[in-house]
Curated annotation (Swiss-Prot):
Keywords: Electron transport, Membrane, Mitochondrion, NAD, Respiratory chain, Translocase, Transmembrane, Transmembrane helix, Transport, Ubiquinone. Core subunit of the mitochondrial membrane respiratory chain NADH dehydrogenase (Complex I) that is believed to belong to the minimal assembly required for catalysis. Complex I functions in the transfer of electrons from NADH to the respiratory chain. The immediate electron acceptor for the enzyme is believed to be ubiquinone. GO terms for molecular function: NADH dehydrogenase (ubiquinone) activity; ubiquinone binding. It is an enzyme of class 7 (translocase). It is found in: Mitochondrion membrane. Its main location: mitochondrion. GO terms for cellular component: mitochondrial membrane. This is NADH-ubiquinone oxidoreductase chain 4. The chain crosses the membrane at residues 22-42, 60-80, 98-118, 147-167, 194-214, 224-244, 257-277, 284-303, 308-330, 351-371, 393-415, 435-455. The gene is MT-ND4. It comes from the Eukaryota. It is a multi-pass membrane protein.
Length: 459
């Protein structure tokens, strides 16, 4: 694991020691090399996972998320270049340092063997994200968004520490490699039910569960492009990863406690998809669609079957790449139109035909068109939930209908129609932007050919 952590940490001195002209090229190329090195983690001959040391390990669940994390840093740097072009060099370097720190914390979160280390790193990701949103966001409302993000996440996750100490006292260990094989189970008392609730709440706020999702649209809309990308692609997946790790430890309790959250997720999935149909703000629409997709993942994790776990892992990776791609496309529109309102960006298909092709591909993956990896994840989850209860097909079917509706609404509003007058002086799409979109789409297409590498622990 150190072969990824050490080079990532060394990107920070590289940032500050690089000359201003070579800074972007240096860091982007080195971070690409790191992401290619991380692909070696896919070679796991044993089912038990690779135990590197007492602190870090990787298995079939954490490996895809680790690779997604390392893959996203060069893409964030490529997307941020125009946004930072007016800033001074010192500020550019501090921005890049924040992104590298965030990647470092995320790698250690996904690779942690001890739950306490996972908790510390889970909390540490809050600091760089908060700085990125409140310092480099576009509008003054970013301070409000940062506060929402901070308080929702902190209040959700502080009780988790107390719960972890309690589990340590009951089971005797918090090691993720040992704890699943421990014979002693947690007692089924009301206090343990409360502990289950505090454990899940920390991760459900991060997912986010419908009802405690209000920080997400604000944070997404106000964050700069790299902030939106990392929030949608990886920080939401922290919640899913934590839930998958902890529900296995709290096994007997999960079966009895999960019902209200399953109901809330199914309801929230339909509600947030309906909200998407009423959005005028492009980034807000993509943020609400993230809430809707993550509700599916919560349902899958709480059902606790091998199929649902496989579906949840596949959908998390697929959604990470798709939502990041949609935010990049929204940002490329924003840089030209200087507004997030969709109707102002209409008719772009005639002006930017190649960008319209990326839009079409992104929208088709978002609405889970066969044979994309998004469909494989959703299909697994729908089958697992249908075997759990037949009535879920009503929610799932309606949600798929709404997802297709709002995705096509987004595509038609931004691409079709008569171009507005101010669009005549618009810049053409840059090679940097086309490369950025291609680097999102190519992994999605490759994963559709070979999905088994991201189906997680149960495959």
């Amino acid at each position: 694991m150190l072969k990824i952590i050490m080079p990532t940490a060394m990107l920070i001195p590289l940032t500050w020691l690089s000359s201003n002209s070579t800074m972007w090229v240096n860091i982007t190329m080195h971070s690409f090399i790191i992401s290619l090195i991380s692909l070696s983690l896919l070679n796991q001959p044993l089912d038990t996972g690779l135990n590197f040391s007492l602190l870090f390990f990787s298995d079939h669940l954490s490996t895809p998320l680790l690779i997604l994390t390392t893959w996203l840093l060069p893409l964030m740097l490529m997307a941020s270049q125009h946004h930072l072009s007016q800033e001074s060099n010192t500020r550019k370097k501090s921005y890049i340092t924040m992104l590298i720190l965030l990647q470092l914390f995320l790698i250690m979160t996904f690779a942690a063997t001890e739950l306490i280390l996972l908790y510390i790193m889970f909390e540490a990701t809050l600091i760089p994200t908060m700085v990125i949103i409140t310092r480099w966001g576009n509008q003054p409302e970013r301070l409000n968004a940062g506060l929402y993000f901070l308080f929702y996440t902190l209040l959700g996750s502080i009780p988790l520490l107390i719960t972890l100490v309690s589990i340590q006292n009951t089971l005797g260990t918090l090691n993720l490699l040992i704890a699943p094989y421990w014979t002693q189970h947690l007692p089924d008392s009301w206090s343990m039910n409360l502990l289950w609730l505090t454990c899940m709440m920390a991760f459900m706020v991060k997912m986010p569960l419908y009802g405690i999702h209000l920080w997400l649209p604000k944070a997404h809309v106000e964050a700069p492009i790299a902030g939106s990308m990392v929030l949608a692609a990886i920080l939401l997946k922290l919640g899913g990863y934590g839930m998958m790790r902890i529900t296995i430890l709290l096994d007997p309790l999960t079966k009895s406690m999960a019902y209200p959250f399953l109901m809330l997720s199914l309801w929230g999935m339909v509600m947030t998809s309906s909200i998407c149909l009423r959005q005028t703000d492009l980034k807000s629409l993509i943020a609400y669609s993230s809430v809707s997709h993550m509700a599916l993942v919560i349902v899958a994790i709480l059902i606790q079957t091998p199929w649902s776990f496989m579906g949840a892992t596949a959908l998390m990776i697929a959604h990470g790449l798709t939502s990041s791609l949609l935010f990049c496309l929204a940002n490329s529109n924003y840089e030209r139109v200087h507004s997030r309102t969709m109707i102002l960006a209409r008719g772009l298909q005639t002006l930017l035909p190649l960008m319209a092709a990326w839009w079409l591909l992104a929208c088709l993956t978002n609405l889970a068109l066969p044979p994309t990896i998004n469909l494989i994840g959703e299909l697994f989850i729908i089958l697992a939930s249908f075997s759990w209860s037949n009535y879920t097909i009503l929610f799932m079917g309606f949600n798929m209908l709404l997802t297709a509706s709002y995705t096509l609404y987004m595509l038609i509003t931004t691409q079709r129609g008569k171009a507005s007058h101010h669009a005549k002086t618009m810049k053409p799409s840059f090679t940097r932007e086309n490369a950025l979109m291609a680097l999102h789409i190519i992994p999605l297409l490759l994963l559709s050919i070979n999905p088994k590498i991201i189906l997680g622990l149960m495959y």
